[in-house]
Amino acid sequence: MNLHAPNAEQDDIEYVDVCAVDDLWDGEMDVFDVGEHEVLLVKHEGRFHAYDGICPHQSVSLVEGHLTEDGVLICKAHEWQFSVEGGQGINPANVCLQSFPLKVEGGRVLIGTEPLPKEGEA
């Protein structure tokens, strides 16, 4: 089952098993080394989301921030805000988080080793 719907073919993606589905409670997040990337895994409203774990502003680990009940991920350094649904910037609106493909199989969460192309990239 794929609980994150990327717009990319997933047949040739290499995935890494990072945790069990039950390891993260709703509203929790954790960071994992996946390939050469630090990837933030967030569970919100029963769905998993995977993003680059480093804030695009000043390279602060996003896992040190917090997730609001309404799905806003806030960086601890300068309170940049991102929607957990898709990684779109809220404050500032012109910046977004890099998404990673993920899937759930056999009660395990697997994250792709390479980020998905940003919108407009091939």
From Swiss-Prot:
Cellular component, GO annotation: cytoplasm
Q: Where in the cell is it found?
A: Cytoplasm
Ranges for domain Rieske come to 16-111
Q: Which GO terms describe its molecular function?
A: 2 iron, 2 sulfur cluster binding; metal ion binding
Q: What does the UniProt record say this protein does?
A: Ferredoxin component of the alkene monooxygenase multicomponent enzyme system which catalyzes the O2- and NADH-dependent epoxidation of short chain (C2 to C6) alkenes to their corresponding epoxides. Functions as an intermediate electron transfer protein.
Family, per entry: Belongs to the bacterial ring-hydroxylating dioxygenase ferredoxin component family.
Name of the protein in its database record = Alkene monooxygenase system, ferredoxin component
Q: Which organism is it from?
A: Xanthobacter autotrophicus (strain ATCC BAA-1158 / Py2)
Q: What gene is behind this protein?
A: xamoC
